[in-house]
């Protein structure tokens, strides 16, 4: 299987942490990055500092998704406001069976997809999250897997990520089902040394994480 992680459009470090962990599995992994971070990973590999230990990972990295084949799994770990800026660049690597995992804080673009609210909000895009539905149109919500991110990490210098705590990436299908693809993604994360609980109502978890963000991010 092939997987790519779209990282570092803004000031992210979670994508690099994911890439380091998942590179320990048998997945064919590529990292999409840019600027000094991409250059450092190309030249020296990605260094992960965790629990006082430093480990280096040689990763395939590119700043042009067009150089990649169609992917089985795509992790998006850019800042939420940047997703609409990158969707055009991903279209060539999204295939019929591609799963897209949004490892991003905030309400996801697919939030009301198969939400079963019994109202006219079902399958409705949120304009404040996804103006004019651009993300919804380019990233088919049927391909989406929800992900709530708990690890904390930082880029201390280009190509170097320091893990500050947490290993849990909570996953869920928009319709709450326990699908085969959900299990496969969870198994991959677990094989990489991460925790990947599967939830039947991930929207509850999204709000719990948001309450935490609202309470503590200002401190």
Regions found by a protein language model. Give the residues of each.
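Internal alpha-helical scaffold of NAD(P)-dependent oxidoreductase catalytic cores
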Residues: 40, 93, 130, 136-208, ...
């Amino acid at each position: 299987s092939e997987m790519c992680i779209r990282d570092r459009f803004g000031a992210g470090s979670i994508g690099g942490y994911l890439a380091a962990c998942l590179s320990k599995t048998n997945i064919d992994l590529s990292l999409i990055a840019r600027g000094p971070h991409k250059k450092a990973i190309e030249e020296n590999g990605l260094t992960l500092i965790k629990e006082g230990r430093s480990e280096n990972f040689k990763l395939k990295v590119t700043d042009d998704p067009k150089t990649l084949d169609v992917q089985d799994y795509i992790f998006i770990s850019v800042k939420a406001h940047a997703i609409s800026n990158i969707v055009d660049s991903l279209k060539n690597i999204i295939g019929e069976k591609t799963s897209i995992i949004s490892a991003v804080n905030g309400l996801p673009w697919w939030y009301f997809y198969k939400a079963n609210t019994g109202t006219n909000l079902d399958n409705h895009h949120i304009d404040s999250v996804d103006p004019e539905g651009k993300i919804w149109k380019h990233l088919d919500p049927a391909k989406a897997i929800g992900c709530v991110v708990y690890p904390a990490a930082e880029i201390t210098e280009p190509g170097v990520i320091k893990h500050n705590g947490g290993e849990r990436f909570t996953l869920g299908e928009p319709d709450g089902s326990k699908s085969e693809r959900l299990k496969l993604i969870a198994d991959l994360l677990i094989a990489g040394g991460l925790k990947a609980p599967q939830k039947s109502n991930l929207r509850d978890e999204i709000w719990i994480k948001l309450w935490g963000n609202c309470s503590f991010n200002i401190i």
